[in-house]
């Protein structure tokens, strides 16, 4: 049996930066100040549980923080302006781990609003990134999730529209919706394609290639990870059996009956250790050889850690 690894897979630069910021902050203030994180630092169960064991307190709102001497970290998904202002009012020291690519969307949305545009956001309802983007502008943003949403859209001025997109959606994810928007509203403007999240597109391109050369795909990632679920969807859409797993303990050995080639990928918020443990498990339980898929992309993107850390 052969294991073929997707390339790239796992951590993107924005997730690595956020996790590094939290780890460095925790080390710096250990036993001195309580470290809080608003929501999950990234959408991965292993990462969150590991930091909880080290003493990090994850909160769902700033009201839960009674210790104003603590340090609050904003997650990689970003927050609204109101949340930022609330932390300042309470006098809480904040370290912002928002992904720079998410910050870029915040700035784009504000720029469009300042130029008088009515805004449309392509994204998923209730995703923390979407909440943050909506909270970065003063006027309401209309959320579009499906083609039907585009057809049902009611706007004030069809000639004065702009759109932005959630970063964890790739060009492929948004292509049809953007095309439908442009068909209905030919004057609509939006960000350059090069502004999309490189990591989302790269991982999706890789898993599509992987699905062509294997019998089954294991996607390492958490159930609440948007990009991990999309990797799963891309495999099943190509007629390949695929499973989204938090770690090796979720594997069912019956999955491998009649399988010769197993593909493995990981969502952008899944750490390498989870893939490594999965490979070790498969080595122990199956006779396997391991290779990396041909034609993959090596990512060299790095984001700076803020000086405050």
UniProtKB/Swiss-Prot annotation:
Transmembrane segments: none annotated. The active site is at 129 (proton donor). GO terms for molecular function: 4 iron, 4 sulfur cluster binding; 4-hydroxy-3-methylbut-2-enyl diphosphate reductase activity; metal ion binding. It catalyses: isopentenyl diphosphate + 2 oxidized [2Fe-2S]-[ferredoxin] + H2O = (2E)-4-hydroxy-3-methylbut-2-enyl diphosphate + 2 reduced [2Fe-2S]-[ferredoxin] + 2 H(+); dimethylallyl diphosphate + 2 oxidized [2Fe-2S]-[ferredoxin] + H2O = (2E)-4-hydroxy-3-methylbut-2-enyl diphosphate + 2 reduced [2Fe-2S]-[ferredoxin] + 2 H(+). It is an enzyme of class 1 (oxidoreductase). One of its GO terms (biological process) is dimethylallyl diphosphate biosynthetic process. Binds 1 [4Fe-4S] cluster per subunit. Isopentenyl diphosphate binds at residues 43, 77, 127, 225-227, 269. Its EC number is 1.17.7.4. HAMAP family: IspH. This is 4-hydroxy-3-methylbut-2-enyl diphosphate reductase. The lineage of its organism: Bacteria, Pseudomonadati, Pseudomonadota, Alphaproteobacteria, Rickettsiales.
